Design a protein with these regions (language model features):
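Short S/T/G/P-rich N-terminal loop/turn motif that feeds into the first structured element of a domain
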Residues: 1-69, 73-99
Length: 99
């Protein structure tokens, strides 16, 4: 079991999203120290999707309780999906698959 969160976020302005992304890039390793992977994808000028992967449910729950509200003030609207990652392919070198 690999607990995974997928969060879609919309922002009032491009600047608000840029502020969020700057803060997330700088602070997310300390806000989510138990995460195995943190990924943020810009989908429009004012929205993005984040993916976070944890080693177990306890780590995911702890991260949620530790960070709720710390970055939320920058987000206009969001929705969260939680589940278990069932397929993972990581390519570290072109042509090589490392799972």
């Amino acid at each position: 079991m690999t607990p995974t969160n997928v969060v879609s976020m919309d922002f009032e302005t491009k600047e608000a999203m840029e502020d969020f992304l700057e803060t997330y890039e700088r602070d997310s390793p300390t806000l989510y120290p138990d995460a195995e992977m943190l990924l943020m994808i810009k989908t429009t000028e004012t929205s993005c999707v984040g993916v976070s992967v944890y080693p177990n449910e306890e780590a995911r729950s702890l991260a949620g309780s530790r960070t709720s509200g710390k970055l939320k003030y920058l987000v206009k609207e969001n929705f969260r999906l939680s589940g278990d990652m069932v397929v993972k392919h990581v390519f570290t070198n072109k042509g090589e698959l490392n799972d």
